[in-house]
From Swiss-Prot:
The modification Phosphoserine is found at residue 2. This is Sterol O-acyltransferase 1. The keyword Transmembrane applies. It catalyses: a sterol + a long-chain fatty acyl-CoA = a long-chain 3-hydroxysterol ester + CoA; cholesterol + an acyl-CoA = a cholesterol ester + CoA; cholesterol + (9Z)-octadecenoyl-CoA = cholesteryl (9Z-octadecenoate) + CoA; cholesterol + hexadecanoyl-CoA = cholesteryl hexadecanoate + CoA. Its EC number is 2.3.1.26.
Amino acid sequence: MSLRNRLSKSGENPEQDEAQKNFMDTYRNGHITMKQLIAKKRLLAAEAEELKPLFMKEVGCHFDDFVTNLIEKSASLDNGGCALTTFSILEEMKKNHRAKDLRAPPEQGKIFISRQSLLDELFEVDHIRTIYHMFIALLILFVLSTIVVDYIDEGRLVLEFNLLAYAFGKFPTVIWTWWAMFLSTLSIPYFLFQRWAHGYSKSSHPLIYSLVHGLLFLVFQLGVLGFVPTYVVLAYTLPPASRFILILEQIRLIMKAHSFVRENIPRVLNAAKEKSSKDPLPTVNQYLYFLFAPTLIYRDNYPRTPTVRWGYVAMQFLQVFGCLFYVYYIFERLCAPLFRNIKQEPFSARVLVLCVFNSILPGVLILFLSFFAFLHCWLNAFAEMLRFGDRMFYKDWWNSTSYSNYYRTWNVVVHDWLYYYVYKDLLWFFSKRFKSAAMLAVFALSAVVHEYALAICLSYFYPVLFVLFMFFGMAFNFIVNDSRKRPIWNIMVWASLFLGYGLILCFYSQEWYARQHCPLKNPTFLDYVRPRTWTCRYVF
């Protein structure tokens, strides 16, 4: 109903019409009492309250249309006003019905637009920046407490970072292994794809030709990127943080190589069908840019910012190092004393419950710091250096009232890869059937990869994260779904996240210290997968 119609219906209310008539009669006679003025004021306020929801609804609809049109227009242009070749390719494929035989519908692909990260926008508000200042003040107090306690215990200032030095030990091995991983990812996938693309249209058996090259690419993904970093990590007995660097880079490069091949195969197939003389291959520079760009979705071109703000880059890296020292002090002041004291009494339900609840605070702080250091500071630093325009690496996950929304907004970079290359491709492959199976596959893959990273980095298999993610996380995804909008559900999401991170920190830390205090002389494979916490009895 429009505002005009709404106003026209005001005459259907006899009480309001009578009040208006009495007021006008009194006004004409030149006599207006205070009582009549108050009645008129209440009448106007009531009408305004009735019109307010309708007015806001119409304004909201117009605003949504305006923003949608603006995004659609800006998506087709980069900052310099030049049309992005990827978008034009997508439009051509959308019009070409033959592309349906080659890949999932192209209109479902991710569209990159220039935008700031959400925290950069929020930090412009003084009230939000104050929360940031609170975390800095807390870090200062952690540092002061450590210095004071060390001075009281040792009688001198002890500025040692033994835990950091141990965690990032054997760093030269990390560097040369990373270079080998990077150079192989830069050369081998591009060479295989280029060789396949040039020979596909000329081959008398294109299917067999494609299967051979696909098998070679799979061997590279699993045999080279999948095996070599893991072997180096285990053979050289790297410490935990050094292991995390190599394993996370291993996973990132595998996902990058898959995206590059996945996005470019349809272009080669289209060119072969149309017998086009135009070379559909991207350049080495485009692939090299993609390997460093803070995204897992390949495009020939991305929105670019006009300049690089080197001061902004330095600030982001400074904040990363600040978060690193923050986590160090959390482990030093909150975690280490807790788990070192666990050995003073045998493992029991009481010890476990106390450990979980005492681990909630450090677990939540580590959650916030990990999110801020990597998803905001680290990715924004590389985005700024590469003039990468689309900075939406996360959304407002803290406002989530459902787990499905939390999974979509917590890590947009990884979510996009899983959504387009696992979920959407499975739906396309099975003709949009088995949606639940496709979602289950996404959860299973994510849970397995997370648990693989932790198992390799910690040198033991303790599937706490796998159980929480695969079973409880998936169940909450269906139970606490997008239909839950009330604030109480946001509280429930936060409470479950707090408890979950407390469980993860408690169980994995207990297992770590149990293996330190109860080592085995000749461990078998089963000893690596059997929890030591359940059988270890500390000797004093």
